[in-house]
Amino acid sequence: MEVDVERVRPRLRGDVYVMRVQEGAYIRSNLGGAMLKGASTYEWIQRIAPMLDGTRTLGELCAAVPESSRAALAKLILLLQGKGYVKNVLDDRPHTLTADLATTYAANIAFIEYFTDSPELRFELYRGSTVVLAGSGPLLQALANSQLRAGVRTPVLAPFAESPFDRDRVAEHLAVAQAQDPEQRIAYRDVEDRHLDRVAADATMVLHVADRPMIERARLLPAAAGAAGAASAQVVVVGDQAWIGPVIGKDGDATAWESAWRRLCALAPDYVGADLRDHPEVAPSEFLRGPTVALVANHLCFAAFRHLTGIDEGTGADHLVRFDLETLETANHAFLPHPLALPAVPDDPARLAALAAAVPVDDEELARRAVDCVDPRTGVFAEITERDYEQLPLFVSEVMVSDPVGLAGGPFPVHGWGESVVESRQRAVRNALERYAAVMVDPRKGDRLHGLDVLTGEPVAVDAAAVFPARTAASGSDWPEAMRAAVAAAAGEMVVAALSTATEPFRRLAMDGAELTPRGARYLKLLEIVEQPFEVHDLSGPLGLPTFAFTTPKGTVAYVSDLDAGVALEKGLERTLLAYQSRAANQPAYAPPSVPGLPANLRGEITETDGTGALPDSVSLEEAVAALTREGGRVVAVPLDHDPFLARTCPFVVRAVVVHG
């Protein structure tokens, strides 16, 4: 392919290093290394390198050498360009950066060039930016030094009062900087917490550092910056950790910092500042001193440099950097928007119309989507793991779930189990999403929430107090399946009331002749192998849908309801097997939740007529609803969707409530 030599203006990247080797030349940069063969290759590169400064076209370079060498020169330069060591800067935008400044900040410019175009212009714009540095103490002093060294012409300092601030030390930093860049200055701005808009006035970017948990200020500052058309980024030190970021663009999500903080505290509710208030009374970490202060400041300065020069253009404000002040280790932590950080959205019944036609989400797809929910510090889930749990006869997985609004008393584990580790993980994820949705309530949505009548599909308003916090939540791969599961869960909530009014013993099932699902038959065989005695009593009569009580000599294991009798029996056998495994392995964490015991006087025996093990009839959704509404009312399915991300990830999490009137 012919190359227009006048459309190539080659410039050697600043990080390129060339070494003579026996085969020719070895060239290396941050892109990697390559061997260029040829006896004179090394000399050629050394000779032309000073001319590869972007000021001449390839045609002009070739014209400067004898005609016999022009083809070889063009071939070598194009080869270097193809491997990424030479860049075509023909389309780079013009700049007015002086040669002295370009030399002084050559490393900064080379770094920009590695990622994007027009590095001199981008650095020039960065240098002229109004970067406001807000905060206090040694961190603010170190940040001022970092900004001067990065090339900002006039950093603007806005000191707050919670920590002593040494202006003389900043003056020393400025004097050192002016030795190589005499144009640099320091400006000051008097501010206070009540007027954060003054901090951000006329700023290109606001950088805030707090050596203690100044959470309210950190929460409000991004909005003030956004209102002024400025980007923002922060460092907030809590305990022995500095939390850096997120970087929020001038048109970015001003709620991102609050979302990150709320997510963090949902997994660490004892964190100082979980109340969203400033805590100037807290002493800074003993490890925040010496070079550690400069390292933290440099992290923030570097984040601002990448943003203002366009290196990170297009990236979202979706992660924090955790800097451990004791070990100096860093880690990135992704987070999702927190519903209470976002603007309030009224409960809208119109959203319900889309549920029936929504695309199904099976267990495999749900587990894939849940990956975005996991982070050990800022995730909806802290981890998905098997720990050291016994994996026979059932596989067991655990998800540590965050407590998003403080209704659960802190993060809590949720378990899943099955016949394979894939199944146990998928079930654990589904159970975890249900439990998270059950405690994720946004009180700003009001006292009335909307759901759908299970039978008619009509929108119905219900009391929010009847829905949240949900004692039970259910889900399915689609809306009809979710409604069936929710109705069965609602029936399960009525078991205790049914026991309190029962006067006759419940029929005991003869398991030898019972019609079981294939999985249920396997569970029954496993219970026989481990020699776990158990009894099953049929509670279906008073509840109006298949419901069984499972008991062992150790007590009542579970009450299970479902519209399908075989499925209900299968689930109960599974929980009985899980209870055995938990007890045998001395691992109570994943044992089925405790339930009220089935009274001895309500435990019937197997009669001759029951010897066939006949199961109660399965019921339709209409029959199950009729059983739940014997005393009137209607069953309403209310989506537990107060977290918008959850509503997209798993749209079919629901609670069924009986509504009267």
Where do the language-model regions lie?
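Long, charge-rich, low-complexity alpha-helical segments
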Residues: 31-158, 164-166
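Short, aromatic/basic amphipathic alpha-helical patches
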Residues: 143-147, 166-179, 220-221, 519-528, ...
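Helix-biased "structured C-terminal domain" signature
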Residues: 104-107, 212, 311-661
